[in-house]
From Swiss-Prot:
The keyword Transcription applies. The lineage of its organism: Eukaryota, Metazoa, Chordata, Craniata, Vertebrata. Component of the Mediator complex, a coactivator involved in the regulated transcription of nearly all RNA polymerase II-dependent genes. Mediator functions as a bridge to convey information from gene-specific regulatory proteins to the basal RNA polymerase II transcription machinery. Mediator is recruited to promoters by direct interactions with regulatory proteins and serves as a scaffold for the assembly of a functional preinitiation complex with RNA polymerase II and the general transcription factors. GO terms for molecular function: transcription coregulator activity. This is Mediator of RNA polymerase II transcription subunit 21. Its main location: nucleus. It comes from Macaca fascicularis. SUPFAM superfamilies: Mediator hinge subcomplex-like. Pfam families: Med21 (PF11221). Belongs to the Mediator complex subunit 21 family. GO terms for cellular component: mediator complex.
Amino acid sequence: MADRLTQLQDAVNSLADQFCNAIGVLQQCGPPASFSNIQTAINKDQPANPTEEYAQLFAALIARTAKDIDVLIDSLPSEESTAALQAASLYKLEEENHEAATCLEDVVYRGDMLLEKIQSALADIAQSQLKTRSGSHSQSLPDS
């Protein structure tokens, strides 16, 4: 997961891409401009141009990305936070970190204990299999 500034930069880059794509598609699909001194014959019976659909699509994409940018900006730390507030926040984070470390150490210890039990059980199983195999081999050998 990226930090907030990286997310914000990615969102701004995405918004710039959307603007460029919107301009390019609208330029490509847009109707020709009419000039007063040039006569052009345009067929009025042409099928509807998909420009309107593209305009709505890009408007929705741009609006959604702009909202995402607003949310990311609002989530950034404010300039109003004082050193005391930052220190308190850091202290709280350190406490949570120590609690998580203690919990992790406990889980690792219990995991090690379970691993030892499993290894001991596997060793017992292997020994008993070896004993049964060696016992069956000695019984199958003829006595001379």
